[in-house]
Amino acid sequence: MRCVKTMRRRTEKIVEAWAKGTSGNIINPISNNQNMPNDDYFFFGILRGSGDMMKRANSYYFADHAYFKAGHDKVPAWYRVTKNAHVNSDLKDFPKDRYEKNFFRTLKPWRTTGSKIVVCPPTGAVEWYFDSHDWLETSIKTLKQHTDREIVVRDKPMNPQVKRIDGVTTIN
């Protein structure tokens, strides 16, 4: 297992913990003009060479900020980890006890009416990684074919003006 440095103090500790737990070796990012040894890799984030390496790796674990309770300074600090993918896209049936214990929020009923759909375009890094430079334009065009609701574009960070929304479209 080769654990790739992030070159950032706050996230380097995550790489170090993964390396310790897997008996992995911490390495610098391998540039595109160098061959990557056939091995398992661990990456945190897609910046500073990790994204390019992930595209070339045969087998890897990818970690990034969690969807719930994200943040390096929270106790406990939560992250998402995937195998050979940027996000987990398989729907699986799991017992709900861990969700209820750690993240519980009352889910509201699915809405089929409303006036606004929020589209959250990718950040520059995600747009680069997925080569999705036309994602926003394509998504809005597709939505307009299926709805007459107002479409609101919300860049990061969260826009407090968008309080009442009825649908959300994101890249990941």
Give the positions of each predicted feature:
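Extended catalytic core of nucleotide-activated donor transferases of GT-like folds
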Residues: 25-74
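Short catalytic/ligand-binding loop motif for oxyanion handling, primarily in non-cytosolic enzymes
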Residues: 49-53, 69-72, 125-129, 159-163
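Catalytic donor nucleotide-activated moiety binding site of glycosyltransferases and closely related
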Residues: 5-6, 136-171
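Short hydrophobic beta-strand segments
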Residues: 1-17, 21, 43, 114-129
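Short His-Asn-centered micro-motif
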Residues: 42-46, 63, 120-122, 153-156, ...
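A short secondary-structure junction signal
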Residues: 127-132, 154
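A nucleotide-sugar donor-handling region in carbohydrate enzymes
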Residues: 58-59, 63-129
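A short, well-structured beta->alpha microelement
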Residues: 15-39, 163-172
